[in-house]
């Protein structure tokens, strides 16, 4: 069983991101922190929530969670060039419909996400992600979006609903 939470949508700009990260790596090294690549990968996410006063408002609708995220030295850091390059590669490869080695086509897959999560690219792209998994052979794939929630659905005010739904899904699949 696989539960995928807050997955990014297919990104047509991923290949450009890979190339730009490769150039940046040659210029500055793999461990360089590039604000340009951060803007390229995450910059558009905060735009919808600009009036909320935090560049991390896209993560969660709960202000306390966002403040805690900002205050934590373990969160909110900028990726290295190498990490950005891997992120762009994952974005490119994840929704490619060729090259999959299907070991367990009966694997139950559940996509969950916040309806307001800019990372998923909207309900249409979220549905396309679910369909991609079905097209590559994982036929028992379902998706559920949670209204009013953003990227960190497990930290939202109504997170108990998400926990409850995932628990019910697991119990159903395991016949518990």
Regions from the language model: what does each represent?
Residues 103-109, 136-139:
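Short, proline-enriched alpha-helix->beta-strand connector loops that line the catalytic pocket
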Residues 118-128:
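Conserved alpha/beta-hydrolase "acid-adjacent" motif
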């Amino acid at each position: 069983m696989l539960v995928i939470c807050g997955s990014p949508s297919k990104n047509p700009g991923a290949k450009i991101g890979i190339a730009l990260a490769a150039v940046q790596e040659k210029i500055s090294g793999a461990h360089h922190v590039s604000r340009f690549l951060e803007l390229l990968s995450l910059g558009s996410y905060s735009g919808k929530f600009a009036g909320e006063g935090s560049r991390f408002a896209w993560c969660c609708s709960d202000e306390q969670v966002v403040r805690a995220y900002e205050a934590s030295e373990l969160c909110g850091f900028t990726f290295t060039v190498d990490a950005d390059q891997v992120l762009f590669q994952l974005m490119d490869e994840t929704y490619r419909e060729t090259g999959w080695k299907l070991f367990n086509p009966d694997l139950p897959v559940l996509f969950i996400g916040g309806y307001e999560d800019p990372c998923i690219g909207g309900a249409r792209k979220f549905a396309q992600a679910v369909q991609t998994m079905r097209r590559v052979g994982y036929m028992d794939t379902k998706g559920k979006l949670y209204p009013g929630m953003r990227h960190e659905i497990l930290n939202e005010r109504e997170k108990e609903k998400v926990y409850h739904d995932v628990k019910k899904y697991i119990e159903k699949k395991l016949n518990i």
